[in-house]
Amino acid sequence: MRTLCSLLLICCLLFSYTTPAANSIIGVSEMERCHKKGGYCYFYCFSSHKKIGSCFPEWPRCCKNIK
């Protein structure tokens, strides 16, 4: 019984450890999507740029030049 509990605890710790890695993969895909649209990721968009999306979780905005 002790071995089973230990094994279950190890499995839970492994799965909880891999969760942040999935979030960083999502962030990379958001950044790639922004760059493919010709934008850039930044905290604020400049006055001559508009927000076209998000680069979550690293940056809150994907900005693009209006020109």
Swiss-Prot record:
<keyword id="KW-0964">Secreted</keyword>
<feature type="signal peptide">
    <location>
        <begin position="1"/>
        <end position="24"/>
    </location>
</feature>
<feature type="disulfide bond">
    <location>
        <begin position="41"/>
        <end position="55"/>
    </location>
</feature>
<comment type="function">
    <text>Has antibacterial activity.</text>
</comment>
<keyword id="KW-0211">Defensin</keyword>
<keyword id="KW-0044">Antibiotic</keyword>
<dbReference type="GO" id="GO:0042742">
    <property type="term" value="P:defense response to bacterium"/>
</dbReference>
<keyword id="KW-0732">Signal</keyword>
<feature type="disulfide bond">
    <location>
        <begin position="34"/>
        <end position="62"/>
    </location>
</feature>
<protein>
    <recommendedName>
        <fullName>Beta-defensin 9</fullName>
    </recommendedName>
</protein>
<dbReference type="Pfam" id="PF00711">
    <property type="entry name" value="Defensin_beta"/>
</dbReference>
<dbReference type="GO" id="GO:0005576">
    <property type="term" value="C:extracellular region"/>
</dbReference>
<comment type="similarity">
    <text>Belongs to the beta-defensin family.</text>
</comment>
<dbReference type="InterPro" id="IPR001855">
    <property type="entry name" value="Defensin_beta-like"/>
</dbReference>
<keyword id="KW-0929">Antimicrobial</keyword>
<keyword id="KW-1015">Disulfide bond</keyword>
<feature type="disulfide bond">
    <location>
        <begin position="45"/>
        <end position="63"/>
    </location>
</feature>
